[in-house]
Regions:
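Catalytic cores of eukaryotic secretory-pathway lumenal/extracellular enzymes that build
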Residues: 1-257
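Terminal low-complexity segments of carbohydrate-biosynthetic enzymes
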Residues: 104-105, 123, 127-139, 143-153, ...
Length: 384
């Protein structure tokens, strides 16, 4: 009963993905593209959605999955159970646990949910997975704010009504689909059981951005579309989306924001969401209380080139984020006890993460190393 569509993006030198055995299978539709023709994952997913042929359901997957026996029955039982609970259009989506490609065995088998991580400086909201608390006690899927593009199960009409924007590239795809699906009347859930595993590694396999030197151009266009669709950072909606890749009419963007505890215009997040409590978020008596419920966490990674750190006797790094006028918005230094772990690696870049609450977006950062012998060394700066 399965119809399978694969967007096969490959190179003549590839030896690990021969699909010849499936080309004559009437249930398998292979869209054959040279790797040089590919424009990324969202483009590929959009291509697949154009092949929808009236099937009752759609399950969107990445490559590299392993399934439990009876996964389809389990998934449909979850779907129908949610409908019996009053959710007309359930969308069951998840980051799923990993498996070891060499052994084929699961790395872990606990079901995951997604939580808010941070707003990127370019706009998109980022999420992270974690184990669903007390999942063994659950009898059904749990509500979600967010969407995973590598496992998404819904009615077949999802392929027509919530199509992937082929001009999206990578980051930003999932948050826009979460909002768009919600406005089309879909209710988002995470499965409370592990139905499959995904291979996340593949370090030796080239990605699209490894082969295509223009990927930064794709990224820039994608980020702009995310910001303008969701109004992130005060961007104004641009209806060149022609509504095909825009919102539905069953709910509004603001209704999603109230449901999820996210406000895109100023990158605001409610504490209820930061505490990883299930949606929907609490209602507020008036607009003032609603506005006061938002905090503005800023999370950022500064990459410092190791070659800039030539001394071997550092005692601290001053580490600050500044506004456009050069005033400190936040300062949290790297102290001496943190330095051994930070500097012991061999990577060319040293990653310094900071997270703090701010309404004003930082404009620049400063890392200023302090050496026992030389005192304050040359400062290292960057624009955000």
């Amino acid at each position: 009963n399965l119809s399978v569509c694969v967007c096969w993006q490959h190179d003549d030198k590839d030896e690990w993905d021969d699909l010849d055995d499936y080309k004559d299978n009437l249930n398998v539709n292979i869209l054959d593209y040279k790797a040089s023709e590919s424009k990324g994952a969202c483009w590929a997913r959009h291509k697949i959605q154009q092949e929808y042929n009236g099937e009752d359901f759609t399950l969107q997957l990445d490559s590299h999955h392993r399934f439990i026996k009876g996964w389809d029955t389990e998934l449909k039982n979850m779907y129908y159970g949610l409908q019996l609970d009053g959710y007309e259009k359930p969308l069951i989506t998840a980051y799923i646990p990993g498996y070891d490609d060499k052994t084929g065995k699961p790395i872990d088998s606990e079901p995951w949910r997604l939580y808010y991580n941070y707003f990127g400086h370019d706009g998109p909201l980022h999420t992270m997975p974690e184990t669903i608390p007390d999942y063994k006690k659950l009898t059904g899927p749990v509500p979600s704010r967010f969407f995973s593009a590598h496992w998404a199960f819904a009615d077949g009409d999802f392929s027509k009504n919530v199509q992937h924007d082929p001009k999206m590239y990578f980051h930003g795809e999932e948050i826009t689909l979460a909002v768009r699906a919600f406005t089309h009347g879909y209710d988002l859930f995470h499965p409370h059981k592990t139905l499959a595993w995904h291979h996340y590694g593949r370090k030796d396999n080239p990605k699209h951005w490894d082969d295509d030197t223009t990927y930064n151009d794709y990224n820039s266009v994608s980020y702009e579309r995310v910001r303008k669709l969701l109004g992130i950072g005060g961007e104004k909606f641009n209806n060149d989306f022609n509504y095909k890749y825009g919102f539905g009419t069953e709910r509004t963007l603001e209704e999603y924001e109230r449901y999820a505890g996210i406000r895109f215009s100023d990158k605001g997040v409610q504490q209820y969401t930061l505490d990883r409590k299930y949606p929907s978020n609490p209602e507020y008596k008036n607009k003032k209380l609603y506005n006061q419920s938002f905090t503005h966490p800023f999370k950022y990674c500064v990459n410092v080139y190791r070659e800039h750190l030539k001394e071997n006797d550092y005692i601290c790094f001053a580490f600050a984020f500044k506004d456009k006028d050069g005033n400190d918005l936040h300062r949290q230094d790297v102290v001496e006890s943190e330095l051994p772990d930070l500097l012991k690696g061999t990577d060319d870049w040293i990653k310094l993460w900071r997270e703090f609450d701010t309404i004003d977006k930082p404009h620049s950062w400063l890392v200023w190393p302090n050496s026992k012998k030389k005192g304050w060394c040359d400062p290292i700066t960057g624009i955000i």
